[in-house]
Regions:
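Glycine-rich FAD pyrophosphate-binding loop
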Residues: 25-45
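A conserved beta-strand/loop capping segment in the N-terminal third of enzymes
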Residues: 53-101
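Predominantly flavin-linked oxidoreductase catalytic cores and closely associated redox partners
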Residues: 105-235
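N-terminal Rossmann-fold NAD(P) dinucleotide-binding loop
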Residues: 17-18
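Beta1/beta-strand and adjacent pyrophosphate-binding region of the FAD-binding site
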Residues: 2-14
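C-terminal helical "tail/cap" subdomain of flavin- and related membrane-associated enzymes
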Residues: 294-372
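FAD/FMN-dependent oxidoreductases across multiple families
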Residues: 212-292
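Conserved N-terminal glycine-rich FAD pyrophosphate-binding loop of Rossmann-like flavoproteins
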Residues: 38-58
Length: 372
């Protein structure tokens, strides 16, 4: 039976949850980091860590030495391609590695890791299947979809017309050699990039309407899109699976979310989901933790909870809402192969830099936030 009383309880030990835990523990607060899984563990993800997350990873002392550098993006259409450079290198890093590294970082900072299934949350604590964690502040880092979203009656869970599903598998092959590739198919898209250990991650997103008749059979769905799109057939032919089967996601719904729900501070995907094509999801998870930490500290120190909640809600919207909106515009294009090809024929060279400005934070601004 677990019974704890702490300053902060965090539900979910992904990149956002572990980062927030480490930041708060370094400020001297007692923190419980709750996750049902043991580490290391795998998760569905594009496994692309954008350059605007690097100041946070570096400040936490995360060693990314084995993660390949990614300095370029290539958008592959039916008849044309478009390539552009990143202003700073990103890294290809698996969730197996990154989640474990951040979790270890949090524990090293003094965080109490709790491996248990959480069954209920409130602003005052977390009920576990085998106990309870009482806390002055609770943070939700359970990802893009969880039982607690339904418990809290968040509006997006009722949306059945905009549901997407992710799928991912690791492969071995020639690799992408410092490039992330983006491919289009009807009602979806996928990204291809290398991670550590000579592995290439192929991860996609598809609208639920495309999955009718497949019933979770991702092999048959991939065969279908390979038959539809020659670039996909050529790409998949270069690789052999490196793991058994696919990982897939719960519904991915791109609807607005509040960064605070019933007094619970939300971070990472629980606070807002950016389209995976941007490669900014993990960066946003780390950045939302960086933004939330001082407001949670303020709530703990000053006791003016409403001011802290409103401050975080406003700062979160300022930093992330425009990115999420722009990601949906680009996803509309990328999930329509004919429209993408028409756009590629325009040869708009500034499209890549424009896309990066609209879907990322300024790296130097994040570095200044880290420096405090």
């Amino acid at each position: 039976m677990t019974s704890l009383t702490v300053d902060v309880a965090i539900v979910g030990a992904g990149p956002g949850g572990s980062t927030l835990a480490a930041l708060l523990a370094r400020r001297g607060y007692s923190v419980a980091l709750i996750d049902r899984d043991d580490f290391p563990r795998d998760k569905l993800c594009g496994e692309f860590l954008s350059y605007d997350a690097m100041p946070i990873a570096e400040a936490l002392g995360i060693d990314l030495g084995g993660a390949p550098y990614i300095g370029h993006c290539r958008v592959v259409g039916r008849g044309r391609t478009y390539a552009f450079d990143f202003p700073h290198p990103a890294r290809g890093v698996s969730r197996v590695f990154l989640d474990d590294a951040l979790h270890r970082c949090a524990v090293a900072a003094g965080v109490q890791a709790v491996t248990a299934m959480a069954t209920a949350v409130s602003r005052d604590g977390v009920t576990l299947e085998n106990g309870i964690v009482r806390a002055r502040v609770v943070a939700g880092a359970w990802g893009r979809w969880g039982r607690f979203d339904q418990q809290l009656e968040r509006a997006f869970v009722r949306d059945r017309s905009h549901r997407n599903f992710g799928f991912k598998r690791h492969y071995r092959g020639e690799g992408t050699n410092g490039v992330i590739e983006l491919y289009s198919f009807a009602n979806g898209y996928l990204g291809v990039s290398d991670v550590e250990g000579g592995i290439t991650n192929i991860c996609g997103l598809v609208h639920a309407r495309r999955l009718q008749g497949h019933k979770g059979k991702w092999d048959s769905f991939v065969e279908e899109i390979r038959a539809e799109e020659k670039p996909l057939e050529a790409m998949y032919a270069r690789y052999e699976p490196a793991q058994d089967g696919f990982l897939s996601s719960e519904p991915v719904i791109f609807r607005s979310r509040s960064a605070v729900e019933e007094g619970i501070f939300m971070i990472g995907d629980a606070s807002g989901v950016i389209d995976p094509l941007t490669g900014n999801g993990m960066a946003m998870a780390l950045q939302s933790a960086l933004v939330a930490a001082p407001f949670i500290a303020e709530a703990l120190n000053d006791g003016d909870r409403k001011r802290s909640e409103d401050g975080y809600r406003n700062r979160h919207a300022e930093l992330f809402n425009h990115r999420i909106a722009w990601s949906r515009r680009v996803a509309f294009l990328l999930s329509r192969p004919a429209l993408l090809d028409a756009a590629l024929r325009l040869r708009f060279r500034a499209a890549g830099p424009f896309f990066l400005r609209k879907t990322r934070a300024d790296r130097d601004a994040i570095a200044r936030m880290v420096a405090g």
